[in-house]
Structure formats: C-alpha cells, structure tokens
C-alpha cells in the first residue's frame, strides 16, 4: 500500500501537468490582463471546462512546485474570448471617439478665437493706416499753412516797406516845398524893398493867378516900348531873358516860373496833389535862391501891373472846361482889369453884371488881353512853356491848365440821374424773385387750414413784378435816357 501511494501521486501529477493549458494559448489574444471576475464566474460550474475544478487549495508553495495559478480567461472557449475582446475594443473605440469629439470642440474654439484675433488685428491695422493718412494730411496742411503765413508775412513786409518809402518821399517833398516857399517869400520881400511900389489888388502874380485859372495871354508891347532903358523892371526882365532861365531844355522858363508860383500859392491842402506837383514839375532843385531868380520875379510882376494899368479889350470864348472855375475866373479878370487902375473902376460893375461863366457846366472861358484881339488858342493838357524867340510879341504869355479833380467828378456824378435797375436783366429778376422763395417754400410745406388763403400779398406783388419786369425796366430806362435841355455856349464881346 505504501508502494502504491507514490505511484498514484505520480500519475495524478502527470495528468495534471498534461491537462494544464500552455501559456501561449492564454497570451494569444492578449486578454489575460483584461479578464473580469463576473465573466469568469459564470462558467465555473459548467461541465464544458477542459479541466476539473480543484477540490482543495495548496497551502504551501511546495505543493504546486512554484507554478502560478492560471487566470480565469483560460477557462473560456475561444468564441467567448473573442466576444470579450470585441467588447473591450468597442469600449476603447468609444473612449477614443469621445476624446476626438472633445478635441474637435477645442479646435473649433481655437478657430473662433483665431478669427476674432484676425478681425481685431485687421481693424487695428485699418485704424493705424487711417491715422497715418490723417497724419500725412495734417502735415501737408501744416506745410500749406506755413507757406500761406510766409507769403502773408512777405506781403506785409513789402507793404510796410512801400508805406515807409511813401512817407519818406512825402517828407522829402514837404521839405522841398518849404524851401521853395521860403525862397519865394525872400524874393518877394527883396523885390518890395528894391522897387518900393505898391502891389496889385490881387497881390503878387503868384496870388493873382491861381491854380484853377484858365489860359491867359498877357502881351504888353506898348508898355515895354514906353519904358525907359534905365527902368529897373525892364532891366530885370532883360536880365531874366538873358539868363539861363530862357533855355527850355536846361532850366525853367518864365512861363514855368509863373505857373509854379500860381500853383503853389492857391491855398490847396498839402497832400497827394503836392506830391504829384513835385513829381511832375520838380521845382525844388530847379529854383535856386539867386539874384537872377529875384530879378525874374520882379520883371514878371512889373509886366503884369503895367498890363493891368492900360485899357484893353477882353474877348471871352466858351470852351469845354471844368464847371466850378467860373468864380475863380471872375476874380482873376477883376484883379487884372480893375486891380490898381482907378479909371477902369467904372467898368467893374459892368463885368459883374454880365455872367462870368458859361451856362454849360463842362465849359470854361478863355481870356485874351491885348491891344489886338487874337483867335482863342486851344487848351492843352499840361504846362506849355514858350521860348522868347518863338513869340512874335515882346510881351509875356502864360498858360496854366489844371487837371480834372476828383471832387468835380463826384459833383458831376451826383448830377446824373440815378437808376434803380442794373444793366443785366437776370440780376433784377433775381432781386425781385429771391425774397419770395422762403414764403413759397413755407406755403408748399405747411398744411393749409380750411378758410386760410394760399397767397401772400408781398409774394403776389413780387410775382406781378416778375411777370411785368421787362416792361418796367424798359419804361424806367426810357425815362432816364431822355436828354435834358441844355443851352449851347456862345461867344460874347465885352
């Protein structure tokens, strides 16, 4: 019996070793680590198990000789093992799909953030470009403003320079005028002391012949012939004729001297006319304070006084000239005819009784004094100096012409009839229609109440004037264009 026990143990151990499944079968599907107790527990009591269930447990390691117990999956059939593997793969696939969906949502969120960032970046770039363009435009405007400021400054500087130069020229001309007047006063005082004779009723020639006097020709051959050779006035006249003042190309002639004295002694305000006189005549440097100048003035005054002391025939002719010179002409005529002559005093009322000037406002009188009546000479536009050799008579001849003044032009313009219509029809039409436009617009926009009229009296009148504007303008222009009767000028013999 003792001998049979070891044999039975060996057979049981050998059978147990043969029936144990190999390790390769268990690891063929790689599911040994993924076994579950629930799946394996259902097959414990089944008869299909390849190996019988153990009836006892080994308590010692030496009982199984160091071999590990098998896993529960090794007791499943291959079909069951495939089903378990498919379940595990489905679960893993589901987890992978969930992860993929999560990642897709994250990618979508990132894309939306990226699109927002791109939009913000584009908007910022647009703002930056707009700011750059605005900065460039501002710089251009600043440059243009700087250029405008520079041009304005340059213009102001040029104007200031011109004004300063103008004031300097005015001061220079005033100084020249003062020196000229002073020299003339000195010459007159010297002449009064030398001659001791009384002055004429109008004073010196500079006072008797005003700036507004007309063309006057004084010829005195009889007086010059009756004078003695030793007369100081005749001698001074001869000295003046022989001096350098007789040459018209180099120095000032007698006519220029008398004309300058008459222009400067007329009592006019010192303004722009002084500047024009000085710039046109240039009397300052051409009038030296010398004995020749004094003799010339003495000779001229003596000639004028001698011509006033004789009875002469005066012929007046009407010519075109300024309207406000009649009074001055009358004074000049009275001063020359009845200034110092007691015999001619009876004829002065006769001169006053007749009209001193023409009725035509644009005409003046040419006075000719002499033994023989000569034809009236035309008025020139400026001073006409005459040489002694060109005049057949030995007497003096003076011509003074005053240019048109602004005050006289304004007076003539005031006398003209005023017209309330312009030259263009469109301007008058707009002037009549435009004030009625707001009323018409208000009438069109506002809601008209019941019983309220749709017209406005002013707009209605303007509409009527607009319709008849052409005829109104024609009638007014025709009434203004009617010529006013004006008497024609003629000649009179005194």
UniProtKB/Swiss-Prot annotation:
Tissues where this protein is expressed: Brain specific. Found in synapses.
Entries under Pfam families matching the protein: Syntaphilin
A biological process from GO: neurotransmitter secretion
Bias kind Polar residues: ranges: 207-217
Domain of life: Eukaryota
Modification Phosphothreonine, positions: 214
Basic and acidic residues bias locations: 344-353
Topology with respect to the bilayer: Single-pass membrane protein
GO CC, alphabetical: cytoplasm; cytoplasmic microtubule; membrane; mitochondrion; neuron projection; presynapse
Disordered: annotated segments: 1-75, 191-246, 338-398
Keywords: Coiled coil, Membrane, Phosphoprotein, Synapse, Synaptosome, Transmembrane, Transmembrane helix
Compositionally biased spans, kind Low complexity: 7-49, 230-246
Designated name of the protein: Syntaphilin
Organism: Homo sapiens
């Amino acid at each position: 019996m003792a001998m049979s026990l070891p044999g039975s143990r060996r057979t049981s151990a050998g059978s147990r070793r043969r029936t144990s499944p190999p390790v390769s079968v268990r690891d063929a599907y790689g599911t040994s680590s993924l076994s579950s107790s629930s799946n394996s527990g259902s097959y414990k009591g089944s008869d299909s198990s390849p190996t019988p269930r153990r009836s006892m447990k080994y308590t010692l390691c030496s009982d199984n000789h160091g071999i590990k117990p098998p896993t529960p999956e090794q007791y499943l059939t291959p079909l069951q093992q495939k089903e378990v593997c498919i379940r595990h793969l489905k679960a893993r696939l589901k987890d992978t799909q969930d992860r993929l969906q999560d990642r897709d949502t994250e990618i979508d969120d990132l894309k939306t953030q990226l699109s927002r960032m791109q939009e913000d970046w584009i908007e910022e770039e647009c703002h930056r470009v707009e700011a750059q363009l605005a900065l460039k435009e501002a710089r251009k405007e600043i440059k243009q403003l700087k250029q405008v400021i520079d041009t304005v400054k340059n213009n102001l500087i040029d104007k200031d320079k011109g004004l300063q130069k103008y004031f300097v020229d005015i001061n220079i001309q005033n100084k020249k005028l003062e020196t000229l007047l002073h020299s003339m006063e000195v010459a007159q005082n010297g002449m009064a002391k030398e001659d001791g004779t009384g002055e004429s009723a109008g004073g010196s020639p500079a006072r008797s012949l005003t700036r507004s006097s007309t063309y006057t020709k004084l010829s005195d051959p009889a007086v010059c012939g009756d004078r003695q050779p030793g007369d100081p006035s005749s001698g001074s006249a001869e000295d003046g004729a022989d001096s350098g003042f007789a040459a018209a190309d180099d120095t000032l002639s007698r006519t220029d001297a008398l004309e300058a004295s008459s222009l400067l002694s007329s009592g006019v305000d010192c303004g722009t006319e002084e500047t024009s006189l000085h710039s046109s005549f240039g009397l300052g440097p051409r009038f030296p304070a010398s004995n020749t100048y004094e003799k010339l003035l003495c000779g001229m005054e003596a000639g004028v006084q001698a011509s006033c002391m004789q009875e002469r025939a005066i012929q007046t002719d009407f010519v075109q000239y300024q309207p406000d010179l009649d009074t001055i002409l009358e004074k000049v005529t009275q001063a020359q005819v009845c200034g110092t002559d007691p015999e001619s005093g009876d004829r002065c009322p006769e001169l006053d009784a007749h009209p001193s000037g023409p009725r035509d406002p644009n005409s003046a009188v040419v006075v000719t004094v002499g033994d023989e009546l000569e034809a009236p000479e035309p008025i020139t536009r400026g001073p006409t100096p005459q040489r002694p050799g060109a005049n057949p008579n030995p007497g003096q001849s003076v011509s003074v012409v005053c240019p048109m003044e602004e005050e006289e032009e304004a007076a003539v313009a005031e006398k003209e009839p005023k017209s309330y219509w312009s030259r263009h029809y469109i301007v008058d039409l707009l002037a009549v229609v435009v004030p009625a436009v707001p009323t018409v617009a208000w009438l069109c926009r506002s809601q008209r109440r019941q019983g309220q009229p749709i017209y406005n009296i002013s707009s209605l009148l303007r509409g009527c004037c607009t319709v008849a504007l052409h005829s109104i303008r024609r009638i007014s222009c025709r009434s203004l264009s009617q010529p006013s009767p004006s008497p024609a000028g003629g000649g009179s013999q005194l």
